[in-house]
Amino acid sequence: MAASSACLVGNGLSVNTTTKQRLSKHFSGRQTSFSSVIRTSKVNVVKASLDGKKKQEGRRDFLKILLGNAGVGLVASGKANADEQGVSSSRMSYSRFLEYLDKDRVNKVDLYENGTIAIVEAVSPELGNRVERVRVQLPGLSQELLQKLRAKNIDFAAHNAQEDQGSVLFNLIGNLAFPALLIGGLFLLSRRSGGGMGGPGGPGNPLQFGQSKAKFQMEPNTGVTFDDVAGVDEAKQDFMEVVEFLKKPERFTAVGAKIPKGVLLIGPPGTGKTLLAKAIAGEAGVPFFSISGSEFVEMFVGVGASRVRDLFKKAKENAPCIVFVDEIDAVGRQRGTGIGGGNDEREQTLNQLLTEMDGFEGNTGVIVVAATNRADILDSALLRPGRFDRQVSVDVPDVKGRTDILKVHAGNKKFDNDVSLEIIAMRTPGFSGADLANLLNEAAILAGRRARTSISSKEIDDSIDRIVAGMEGTVMTDGKSKSLVAYHEVGHAVCGTLTPGHDAVQKVTLIPRGQARGLTWFIPSDDPTLISKQQLFARIVGGLGGRAAEEIIFGDSEVTTGAVGDLQQITGLARQMVTTFGMSDIGPWSLMDSSAQSDVIMRMMARNSMSEKLAEDIDSAVKKLSDSAYEIALSHIKNNREAMDKLVEVLLEKETIGGDEFRAILSEFTEIPPENRVPSSTTTTPASAPTPAAV
């Protein structure tokens, strides 16, 4: 026999042995053997202790092997038993039995039920002369049949049914043993795996479906404090009061103040809502529960409401504490939209959440902190005082906030002397805290890839381009396509610069990024939340500049699909001017509910609530805005053909033109509107908000 070796690791020891073992067991007259060869050698200490998780995995592996061996044994036993008994469930007619008897194919006959049933052991030619056991229904035990059996010298015997009850019971137990063992083993596996496939309360343990999945930290060690949170000073101030109340409640109760029951964080993604919650846990030093809103909802009815009850029960037992619910819009969506019916699982869960929050007694010390970026779809009952007493807006930071955030994330990075965090903050309007962290991380990755010891301005520039527009592609070779893209991008820049109120050009490039073969970058205004009608209309003109350049330079038949992204943007902007901002001939009306802006179903319902005449007026107003902007773009291209040709010539040569160089060349041929003139020092490097040409 070939030798094999096995290495056993357990209780911190690595053991090798040299002994042979052989195990054997008889199953119904058949012998099944299991052999293993183990070599013995030296004992070496590998580890002082074994991790609990490895122990548990070892038990599960052992249980799986045990179940597998038991299954093999039972199958082997059943097969051997079946080979002995044959196919006793097969039936044979009485006439065929007599035919077999005449041809000497019957070996044995067992009679049951007073001779009315016979189990016959016969040789079947259809099965290659195999011996099979068949059941024959006899008309009665006749003397002629007995005499025939004696004459053929066939072994036959009569049996009482009571005598066979033991074997029937044994066969029944044998048939049920394997399923019972399998089910029991699976149950033990699910128990030992801590709740089965779904974890505690998951599908593996049905008894824990209604238990909360919230992560509980008695002494939270998130590693985050308010010093790590920058750019959201107003939100920090509100939460500092909450932390003070949890630490020193007597200071507030002495003057009759009550603890706020809930704080709702509202803001776009990446602005630091979850980071603020971690900072609260780190500062307060009280028990901290964290859970996602989606974990309340399951496929089974009532599970979500049960988990809400279980969560708040644990919170009250550990008060004072903080309960953080991330993405609460998953469970707090507005009710009564007609979607899912009155018994929708989300509505039941929301009803239970409202009840639990409103059922708190005064000053219990339990504060619910929730975060969402879809406050417009939350149920109004969830937002009233007494539930979420405070609503804190966490918006994208301003220049000062961006500078503070960059200082936090730049603490562990090395920069060249020419890198200024203040300049980076000025160049990144609209960036959230997560975007700024990603920006510096991308710059550090690029510096490492280029074998640099510190981050330079070049890495910062490339990182901004990469985050906003995507990965850099291969530059196009000279040809008609490259010339067309150059005219397209210069058309954007010229129409934008010559239209009063438009953002300043940052750079024009033919270097492809993402899906765009060329890009025109503009500097957004300092306050992106306040935009005038003139600025919006100028952006529509600038967006149509690429399409206008293609039509004027190459002819109407040569217009390409490169303006598809531009058309989508300017159509959406024009529709917003008409339906949301009231900047059209229809009048200062808000024709679209704010909650319908980000919800497809609500948008459809709002559209259906309009009259046909009003819908036609909206479409006409949108078309009028787009048509008038396109006429202006066409006139800019026609009146500045020489400037266009010169700019395209320089762009094809350099592949990238900076904003200052672009305006210097353009001003040689035409006058730039005073409001669009920009000091040269403000546009030395690219910023955000590109206008792509997806040719």
Swiss-Prot record:
GO biological process annotation, one example: chloroplast organization
Residues annotated as transmembrane: 168-188
Cofactor(s) listed in the protein's UniProt record: Zn(2+)
Post-translational changes noted in the entry: The FTSH2 precursor is ubiquitinated by CHIP in the cytoplasm.
Tissue specificity field: Expressed in cotyledons, cauline and rosette leaves, stems, sepals, flovers and siliques. Very low in roots.
Assigned keywords, A-Z: ATP-binding, Chloroplast, Developmental protein, Hydrolase, Membrane, Metal-binding, Metalloprotease, Nucleotide-binding, Plastid, Protease, Thylakoid, Transit peptide, Transmembrane, Transmembrane helix, Ubl conjugation, Zinc
Cofactor: binding comment: Binds 1 zinc ion per subunit.
Positions that bind Zn(2+): H488, H492, D566
Ranges per topology, Stromal: 189-695
Keyword Cell inner membrane carried by entry: no
Gene null: resulting phenotype: Leaf-variegated. Mutations can be complemented by overexpression of FTSH8. The presence of both FTSH1 or FTSH5 (subunit type A) and FTSH2 or FTSH8 (subunit type B) is essential for an active complex formation.
The protein's role, per its UniProt record: Part of a complex that function as an ATP-dependent zinc metallopeptidase. Involved in the thylakoid formation and in the removal of damaged D1 in the photosystem II, preventing cell death under high-intensity light conditions, but not involved in thermotolerance.
Subunit structure, interactors included: Interacts with CHIP and FTSH5. Heterohexamers with FTSH1, FTSH5 and FTSH8. May also form homooligomers.
Sequence similarity: In the N-terminal section; belongs to the AAA ATPase family.
Protein name: ATP-dependent zinc metalloprotease FTSH 2, chloroplastic
Chain's gene name: FTSH2
